[in-house]
Amino acid sequence: MAERLTGKPVADAIKEELKGRVADLKAKGIVPKLGIVRVGARPDDLYYEGGAKKTCESIGMDYEVFEYPQDIDQESFEKAIIEIGAKKDIHGILMFSPLPKHLNERKIRSLIPVEKDVDSLTLGSAGKVFADDPTGFPPCTPTAVMEILKYYNIPLEGKRAVVLGRSLVVGKPAAILLLRENATVTICHSRTKNLPDVCREADILVAAVGRAKMVKEDYVKPGMVVIDVGINEDPDNPGKYCGDVDFDKVEPIVDKITPVPGGVGSVTTAVLCKHTVKACEILNGLV
């Protein structure tokens, strides 16, 4: 049976480190603060928001929720985002997406100040991540993947990493972050030929396609590390969730694997707070 790379100890270690950094900031009269922007009240957004609030509270960080009705118009929402971005006491901004279809999301994202964009919503942040600029913040989910690999001392240099999925939110930034650690990276997608064969070449497989239990036993090999980013409704167990990996079939074969739930997702709010604390330090000229 594979070793389960659970997220809780990773998140706990991040939060423990952040408590000290927040205390240092408070000693200077600075309180890091996250602004959470939400339109409507989707259950998934409310669930993540609850986790973010809890994490902020656990490390002594502040937060403020900016909630808007589902039918808010473009002009009003743009004005609201500009006002939030200008607040000196807000150091990081999380905006839930997708926004309602009548809103121009690309335009609204562009109004978030890059230095407060702690989940890589803007093109400016994406550019910084691509250019390895240390002041840029990658999306929280692929950063959580890297935090897990680091915590469990999984070597990356010279290793073959396959990223299954090419989204701007996970796949592409995950590939960039793996490249930073000198892994040799392949990105796979729906048009990749002989997909299971390509995935089997990996030492580390990152599954981020958003398809329940897509990764079967023919995608993996003994000795592999599997990081499952997916969170999907389980087709075999109504009301429950599963990842992109068919856990029961893959776990007996591979060396290490993240569970769903309890894996990558449980680390993302800790990363969100870590990014916000760093943004606060940068904005106050402390790094």
UniProtKB/Swiss-Prot annotation:
Catalysed reactions listed for this entry: (6R)-5,10-methylene-5,6,7,8-tetrahydrofolate + NADP(+) = (6R)-5,10-methenyltetrahydrofolate + NADPH; (6R)-5,10-methenyltetrahydrofolate + H2O = (6R)-10-formyltetrahydrofolate + H(+)
Q: Does the keyword Transcription regulation apply?
A: no
Segments traversing the membrane: none
Q: What's the EC number here?
A: 1.5.1.5, 3.5.4.9
| Claim: Hydrolase is one of the keywords in the record | yes
One cellular-component annotation, GO: cytosol
User: One GO molecular-function annotation for this sequence?
Assistant: methylenetetrahydrofolate dehydrogenase (NADP+) activity
What are the record keywords, sorted? Amino-acid biosynthesis, Histidine biosynthesis, Hydrolase, Methionine biosynthesis, Multifunctional enzyme, NADP, One-carbon metabolism, Oxidoreductase, Purine biosynthesis
Biological role stated in the UniProt entry: Catalyzes the oxidation of 5,10-methylenetetrahydrofolate to 5,10-methenyltetrahydrofolate and then the hydrolysis of 5,10-methenyltetrahydrofolate to 10-formyltetrahydrofolate.
Q: Which PANTHER family match?
A: C-1-TETRAHYDROFOLATE SYNTHASE, CYTOPLASMIC, C-1-TETRAHYDROFOLATE SYNTHASE, CYTOPLASMIC-RELATED
**Binding partners and assembly:** Homodimer.
Instruction: Indicate what this protein is called per its UniProt record.
Output: Bifunctional protein FolD
